[in-house]
């Protein structure tokens, strides 16, 4: 799959195991590296690193996984918060720790199910995150990604200003607002 998809234009491989079992990620990482494309090793976030009673899913746990992925040769480390569990202050603390542990870029992926998405991204930006995933405003929130429109505005005029034209985003927002209505029954 990796070779064929690479031959047909896939440029970035986000490789993860839902249980963060590094042994299960070795072969796909090795194969993706052979393609010469970007290999992003992802760590699935769960638990609550701010909870003093949390014994397994700690900052040390995530840092160890990140070091293992970097050692495998991953070009980027993704923190994949598929359940919107990562709280804003936890994001700041964890991204700071990951930036200290590895030398490759850190990519944060979250969903906005809890409504914390933008706050989480702002704290991650303060901590130095390199990449985040967003959705255009009219397609964002709920189980989608946080709003790109909101993030661009929140960061405007700061050291993390995206440089993205908000007026251009409004054009896209209006287009997709119409499209979203088609899929409303499936939300």
Residue ranges and their predicted role:
Residues 1-187:
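Catalytic cores and adjacent flexible loops of soluble metabolic enzymes
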């Amino acid at each position: 799959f990796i070779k064929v998809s690479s031959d047909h234009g896939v440029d970035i491989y986000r490789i993860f195991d839902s249980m963060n079992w590094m042994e299960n990620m070795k072969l796909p990482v090795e194969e993706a590296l052979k393609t010469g494309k970007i290999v992003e090793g992802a760590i699935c976030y769960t638990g609550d690193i701010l909870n003093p009673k949390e014994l397994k899913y700690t900052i040390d746990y995530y840092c160890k996984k990140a070091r293992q992925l970097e050692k495998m040769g991953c070009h980027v480390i993704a923190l994949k918060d598929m359940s919107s569990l990562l709280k804003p202050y936890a994001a700041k603390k964890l991204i700071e720790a990951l930036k200290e542990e590895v030398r490759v870029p850190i990519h944060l992926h979250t969903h906005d199910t809890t409504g914390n998405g933008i706050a989480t991204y702002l704290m991650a930006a303060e901590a130095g995150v390199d990449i985040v995933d967003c959705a255009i405003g009219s397609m964002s929130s709920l189980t989608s990604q946080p709003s790109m429109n909101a993030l661009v505005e929140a960061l405007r005029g700061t050291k993390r200003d995206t440089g993205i034209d908000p007026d251009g985003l409004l054009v896209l927002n209006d287009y997709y607002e119409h499209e979203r209505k088609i899929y409303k029954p499936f939300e």
